């Protein structure tokens, strides 16, 4: 179920505060975050945000097409190794 339009989108306060400070100073630094549930807002455009995927932080450059998506959508947590070949040993 989608979030109510009466409410504002969820953005972690510490991330938003860091981005606003960087926008005021006009700096471009990598912002490290564990908040995968945060929604990308227009203030984040042009910044690089390192999102945690459970093992490491993946740097993601935010563009205008990413607005209203969540940060976790761009940092996959599972690594697909591929299907097993026809292995005669594993079958009975």
Curated annotation (Swiss-Prot):
GO BP, sorted A to Z: ribosomal small subunit assembly; translation
TM stretches of this protein: none
GO molecular function: rRNA binding; structural constituent of ribosome
Disulfide bonds listed in the record: none
Cellular component GO terms, alphabetical: chloroplast; mitochondrial small ribosomal subunit
Keywords: Chloroplast, Plastid, Ribonucleoprotein, Ribosomal protein, RNA-binding, rRNA-binding
Localization of this protein: Plastid, Chloroplast
Its job: Protein S19 forms a complex with S13 that binds strongly to the 16S ribosomal RNA.
The family this protein is said to belong to: Belongs to the universal ribosomal protein uS19 family.
Protein name: Small ribosomal subunit protein uS19c
Species this chain originates from: Pinus thunbergii (Japanese black pine)
Gene: rps19
């Amino acid at each position: 179920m989608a979030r109510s339009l009466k409410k504002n989108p969820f953005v972690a306060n510490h991330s938003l505060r860091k981005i606003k400070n960087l926008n005021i100073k006009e700096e471009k630094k990598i912002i490290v975050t564990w908040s995968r549930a945060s929604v990308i807002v227009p203030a984040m455009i042009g910044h690089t945000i390192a999102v945690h995927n459970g093992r490491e932080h993946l740097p993601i450059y935010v563009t205008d097409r990413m607005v209203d998506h969540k940060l976790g959508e761009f940092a996959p947590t599972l690594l697909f190794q591929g299907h097993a070949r026809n292995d005669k040993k594993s079958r009975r």
